[in-house]
């Protein structure tokens, strides 16, 4: 929370209540940093540097204090850290949080082009804010502005609590009904509440905001042969998965038996012995399953083959219809908007079960979209847009 003109110290109690709504996102730690014009709060899920990465994190350089609240992970943090050390920066922790704030001090907004990872963060310094979101918008970041007041949050519900009201935005609602469960980048279904767009950053100063884009997808002609393309994808997938194994807590994998999760499990098992894997099933699924064009059989035997091949420690979570129905409201509240009904509730329940033993789980959810493998993309009557033809974007 930031207010250029007004004293926010009388808002600490209310701010604390707002932050409490996010404790389920980060149950390991809960802290607030307050000053006259800025309140920063953080609920932490400890993954890297369990003791040294507490937030809000303060870093002092040239007698200027920088305070950051950060959600995400920078996979190439060690490379960036070595570069910063060579340039004279000092570190007191092993966390990527400190690397992010030091990178901003050293390079300004250009630091965002160095980060290979997923992130959203706010840095406060000299009564100014720098706010940023990762290239693909994996990590959420919402904001509200009225006059000199700005509120930022990972979830909309905190902003709604402060406002004490909920006004639906007509355009956002139309988009939700037409594009559901999504709306166009930057929009939400609530009036005056916005999402910072992926690959954008915001400077806030003197009660004003300035938003800029720092990265964009590039269109490039794809001239590689089939064999070269297979090799390239194999290298990229291996590199991506290996980077995401950076963790000070155990890592697990979701395993559905499909290509995506099976590949992730196979690669991960090269680096983690006796890997834990999880699958979800539904009560009486064997009785009611109906084969169709894109899934002719149940996935059980594929799961069995993969878990046996890689010798994983496997657990299947079985959900009942009643459980799915009963968790619909909770999944709706978690999303702060209507979503994908039973898909949301089943994923919520599945994730809860995994969280009893693991904080980190790798998933192949939506990975098939990268290579347009979903059936909606391969219908015979699907029209290929000229802009995408023969290109890798």
Name the predicted role of every residue range.
Residues 335-343:
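Long, Lys/Arg- and hydrophobic-enriched amphipathic alpha-helices
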């Amino acid at each position: 929370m930031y207010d250029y003109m007004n004293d926010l110290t009388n808002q600490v109690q209310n701010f604390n209540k707002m932050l409490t709504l996010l404790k389920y996102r980060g149950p390991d730690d809960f802290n607030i940093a307050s000053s006259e014009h800025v309140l920063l709060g953080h609920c932490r899920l400890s993954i890297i540097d369990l003791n040294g990465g507490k937030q809000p994190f303060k870093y002092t350089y040239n007698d200027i204090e920088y305070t950051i609240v950060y959600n995400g992970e920078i996979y190439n943090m060690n490379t960036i850290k070595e570069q910063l050390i060579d340039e004279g920066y000092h570190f007191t922790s092993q966390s990527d949080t400190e690397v992010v704030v030091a990178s901003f001090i050293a390079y300004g907004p250009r630091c965002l082009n160095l980060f290979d990872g997923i992130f959203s963060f706010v840095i406060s310094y000299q009564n100014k804010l720098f706010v940023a979101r990762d290239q693909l918008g994996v990590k959420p970041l919402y904001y509200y502005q009225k006059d000199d007041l700005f509120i930022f949050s990972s979830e909309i519900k905190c902003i709604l609590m402060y406002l004490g009201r909920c006004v639906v935005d007509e355009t956002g609602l139309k988009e939700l009904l037409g594009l559901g469960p999504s709306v166009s980048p930057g929009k939400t279904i609530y009036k005056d509440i916005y999402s910072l767009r992926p690959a954008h950053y915001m400077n806030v100063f003197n009660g004003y905001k300035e938003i800029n884009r720092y990265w964009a997808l590039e269109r490039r002609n794809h001239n590689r042969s089939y064999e070269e393309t297979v090799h390239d994808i194999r290298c990229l997938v291996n590199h991506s998965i290996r980077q995401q194994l950076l963790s000070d807590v155990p890592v697990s994998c979701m395993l559905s038996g499909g290509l995506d999760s099976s590949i992730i499990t196979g690669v991960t098992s090269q680096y983690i012995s006796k890997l834990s894997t999880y699958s979800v099933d539904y009560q009486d699924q064997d009785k009611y399953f109906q084969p169709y064009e894109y899934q002719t059989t149940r996935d059980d035997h594929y799961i069995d083959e993969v878990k046996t091949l890689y010798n994983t420690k496997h657990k299947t979570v079985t959900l009942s219809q009643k459980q799915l129905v009963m968790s619909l409201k909770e999944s709706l509240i978690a999303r702060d908007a209507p979503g994908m009904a039973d898909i949301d509730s089943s994923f919520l329940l599945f994730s809860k079960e995994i969280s009893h033993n693991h904080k980190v789980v790798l998933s192949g959810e939506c990975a098939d979209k990268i290579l347009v493998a979903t059936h909606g993309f391969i219908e015979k009557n699907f029209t290929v847009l000229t802009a995408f033809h023969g290109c890798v974007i």
